[in-house]
UniProtKB/Swiss-Prot annotation:
Reactions catalysed according to its record: S-(5-deoxy-D-ribos-5-yl)-L-homocysteine = (S)-4,5-dihydroxypentane-2,3-dione + L-homocysteine
Family annotation (HAMAP family): LuxS (MF_00091)
Quaternary structure and partners: Homodimer.
Name this protein carries in UniProt: S-ribosylhomocysteine lyase
Family note: Belongs to the LuxS family.
Entry-linked InterPro entries: LuxS_sf, Metalloenz_LuxS/M16, S-ribosylhomocysteinase
Enzyme class of the recorded protein, top EC level: lyase
UniProt superkingdom: Bacteria
EC number: 4.4.1.21
Free-text function comment from the UniProt entry: Involved in the synthesis of autoinducer 2 (AI-2) which is secreted by bacteria and is used to communicate both the cell density and the metabolic potential of the environment. The regulation of gene expression in response to changes in cell density is called quorum sensing. Catalyzes the transformation of S-ribosylhomocysteine (RHC) to homocysteine (HC) and 4,5-dihydroxy-2,3-pentadione (DPD).
Keyword Metal-binding applies: yes
Length: 168
């Protein structure tokens, strides 16, 4: 099985909260697709709660689009990582890390303005696979954590995993 790019970076030295360009691809028609690692938690030291990450998934996807989409950027998808330490964001365009960090920070401020769980978008049996598994309180706690710590930038060259550690 091929080694995925996300496993070629050293998770023991990753900063969080932090933005990292995980991959840039060019389509056959010439469009750039950028995948960002939006790391909310320090790997193996912090973790997002299942209910909190689910609520963030519903809120973060919309708020990031409000703050980042424009003439040269369109978000395709924002999905939680299986390890529950962050999200991957795929988009058309090549915004820089600081633009993404600014949009992320603004989105966390927006999360804090949501005061009633009943106003979370798509939180119903028809549009959500586990609509009862949400926590606005946990999402607020995560948003406050990101705002208080600020958002750093992780560079791939600083995180390159030593080849001796690959496929242990």
């Amino acid at each position: 099985m091929p080694l995925l790019d996300s496993f070629k970076v050293d998770h023991t030295v990753m900063k969080a909260p932090a933005v990292r360009v995980a991959k840039i691809m060019r389509t056959p028609k010439g469009d750039d697709i950028t995948v960002f690692d939006l790391r909310f938690c320090v790997p193996n030291k912090e973790i997002l709660s299942p209910k909190g990450i689910h609520t963030l998934e519903h809120l973060f996807a919309g708020f990031m689009r409000e703050h980042l989409n424009g003439d040269s950027v369109e978000i395709i998808d924002i999905s939680p990582m299986g390890c529950r330490t962050g999200f991957y964001m795929s988009l058309i365009g090549t915004p820089n890390e600081q633009q993404v960090a600014d949009a992320w920070l603004a989105s966390m401020r927006d999360v804090l303005t949501v005061q009633d769980q009943s106003t979370i978008p798509e939180l119903n049996i028809y549009q959500c696979g586990t609509y009862t598994e949400h926590s606005l309180a946990d999402a607020h706690e995560t948003a406050r954590h990101v705002i208080e710590k600020g958002i750093a930038i992780n560079k791939n060259e600083d995180l390159l995993l030593d080849e001796k550690l690959l496929n242990l």
